[in-house]
Each structure stands twice: as C-alpha cells, then as structure tokens.
C-alpha cells in the first residue's frame, strides 16, 4: 500500500528488511515500519539517516521521547496536556504504597518507563498486589510510573502527522481484560475496533491528540486517549503507530497511505531534493 502510494506522489519505494549504512546513502528518505526502541537497530538506522541528511520517520528525537515515559510525563505536565494523575516511584515500602493509594485510589496502573503496546504494564487491585508488583518491577528498572486507573470501554487512537490528525480509531478492550492488548501466556489477543473520519471525533479528543503529539515532535504518531464524559486523558504517544490494512485505513483507504507519502514528498521538496 505504501509502495503504490509512493509511486502516486512521484517516487520509487523499496521495501527492505535489512539496510546497511552504505545502502542507506542511495535513498532520499527512510520510513521505519518496525517497532522502535532506543537500544535497537531501528534507532541506529534513524541516526545514520539523519547524519546523511535523509528525511526519516521516525526521527531519533521521536523514538527517544516516545520510548521514555519520564520525558512524556514531564512534557505533558509542562505543555498542559490532559493526562491521568501519575507519579514515579523508586521504592515499594508500605509508606510509599499507602501514599499512592491515598493519592490515586485503587486500582492503580503500573508501567515500566520504557514499555509499549501494553507490555510492561500492570494493574494492582489492592495494597498487597501493589507492593508485590512494584518490588518485581523495581528489580528491573530504577523507576516505575504509577497512574490512576481510568476505566473506559475503548481507547481513542488518533493518528497525527506533521501536527495534523489524519485518522481516528476506537480500540475496544479485550473481553474480560482491562487492556486493548492481552499478552497472557503465549497467546496474544486484541479487542475490536471502529474507524471513523477525524471530523466525527469529539473536539476535546482531537485537541488533546494534537497537543500531545506536539510535545514529541512533528512526525507520525499514534496518540492513545481515554474519554469519560467531557474529560479526556492522554495515555501515551506512540511513534511508529500501527497502520494495518482494514483497520486504521478503513475510512480513508488508499488516501491514508498517500497522505503519509505526500508528507515525505513535501519534506524532500523543502530540502530541495
């Protein structure tokens, strides 16, 4: 789909699964469609592309910021992005647990600073579970993000490109599970979805998505938002959001891919390629 869209806006696109730094120099633009991480070849490739002056999405700044919940939390507070009440903890004493419960109530959501796609994310229903889970998580990370729990039937996922919303989905929770992804054991399941035009999305949801994306950069992001009544809460900003045939493209179809490829064309033009 992306290859056809690239042709339509006037350039040839190759799908590559591996790319050496020499080969990278033959291209004008790089679009990473693999889950990114900091200590990972995707980040190294993005950095190499930037050094070569190649237009790249996701850029290294976006990868660093999206993979870092400490940064996102601070940026949201500073830019006044509506988000769930949250704090970072570095110990799991009774005192810490009691204060968390007093401040945020129960259940609580616990996240590793570098978690994504519902992995490394846990829910604690009571003090014992909170203490046990915190101890376990602090064994692998110096900090754990603790958030108030907000129940909703679905999460909004707003795709934002260059500061503008381009697609909107509702991802529903997995049956009998509190997240949109369930990684129980070896089985992986995800809930249902609904895709709609961005003009049908409530205004506060779109505004929050644009504001949250701006705190990260001007690339392509998937912003996850919960809405209860008139209140909206940004849960996180994902670089490299999934764009699956029949899901995110269900409303716009081919146009979604063309919009993204056009962004590359525009950026190349700005650089005089």
PLM feature spans:
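Phosphate-binding site of ATP-dependent enzymes
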Residues: 122-216
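C-terminal active-site "lid" helix and adjoining low-complexity regulatory extension at the edge
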Residues: 3, 200, 214-215, 227-273
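ATP-grasp fold ATP-binding core
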Residues: 76-77, 101-119, 141-156
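Rossmann-like NAD(P)H-binding beta-loop-alpha module
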Residues: 84-107
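A short glycine-rich, hydrophobically flanked beta-strand micro-motif that places a catalytic Asp/Glu
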Residues: 15-18, 147, 218-229
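Protein kinase-like catalytic core scaffold
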Residues: 108, 165-167, 221, 233-236
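Conserved N-proximal alpha/beta basic substrate-recognition cap immediately N-terminal to
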Residues: 1-85
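Glycine-rich phosphate-binding loop of ATP-grasp-fold ATP-dependent ligases
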Residues: 72, 84-86, 108-133, 155
């Amino acid at each position: 789909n992306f290859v056809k869209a690239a042709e339509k806006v006037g350039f040839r696109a190759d799908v590559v699964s591996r790319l050496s730094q020499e080969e990278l120099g033959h291209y004008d633009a790089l679009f990473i469609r693999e889950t990114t991480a900091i200590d990972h070849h995707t980040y190294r490739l993005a950095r190499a592309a930037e050094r070569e002056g190649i237009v790249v999405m996701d850029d290294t700044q976006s990868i660093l910021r999206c993979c870092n919940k400490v940064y996102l939390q601070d940026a949201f507070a500073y830019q006044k992005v509506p988000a769930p009440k949250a704090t970072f903890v570095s110990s799991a004493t009774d005192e810490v647990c009691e204060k968390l419960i007093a401040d945020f109530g129960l259940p609580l959501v616990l996240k590793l600073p570098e978690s994504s796609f519902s992995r490394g994310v846990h829910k604690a229903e009571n003090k014992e579970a909170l203490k046990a889970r915190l101890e376990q998580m602090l064994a692998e990370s110096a900090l754990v993000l603790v958030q108030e729990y907000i129940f909703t039937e679905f999460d909004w996922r707003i795709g934002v490109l260059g500061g503008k919303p381009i697609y909107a989905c509702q991802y529903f929770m997995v049956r009998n599970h509190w997240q949109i992804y369930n990684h129980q054991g070896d089985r992986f399941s995800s809930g249902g979805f609904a895709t709609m035009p961005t003009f049908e999305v409530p205004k506060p949801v779109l505004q929050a998505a644009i504001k949250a994306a701006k705190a990260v950069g001007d690339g392509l992001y998937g912003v996850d938002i919960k809405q209860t009544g008139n209140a909206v809460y940004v849960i996180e900003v994902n670089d490299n959001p999934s764009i699956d045939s029949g899901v995110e493209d269900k409303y716009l179809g081919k146009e979604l891919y063309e919009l993204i490829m056009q962004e590359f064309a525009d950026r190349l033009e700005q650089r005089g390629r």
